Amino acid sequence: MKIQLFFFILLFWVTILPAKMKYPEYGSLDLRRECRMGNGRCKNQCHENEIRIAYCIRPGTHCCLQQ
């Protein structure tokens, strides 16, 4: 079991960490912040006078923009 943990940590250290340093723009995208920067609000349901453009954090919440 310890050897498996060692190989898992080694695999993580060799593959994921260098990729995160090389491509930080793909690491984590805060969709909630992006929605707020576009004058939107994260809601479960958009009203009739709002446009749904994307998901916020979960697939159940939408970024709603005023028309």
Swiss-Prot record:
Its main location: secreted. Residues 1-19 form the signal peptide. Keywords: Antibiotic, Antimicrobial, Defensin, Disulfide bond, Secreted, Signal. One of its GO terms (biological process) is cell chemotaxis. It is found in: Secreted. The keyword S-adenosyl-L-methionine does not apply. GO terms for cellular component: extracellular space. GO terms for molecular function: CCR6 chemokine receptor binding; chemoattractant activity. Disulfide bonds join 35-63, 42-56, 46-64. The keyword Signal applies. It comes from the Eukaryota. Has antibacterial activity. Belongs to the beta-defensin family. This is Beta-defensin 110. It comes from Pan troglodytes. The lineage of its organism: Eukaryota, Metazoa, Chordata, Craniata, Vertebrata. The gene is DEFB110.
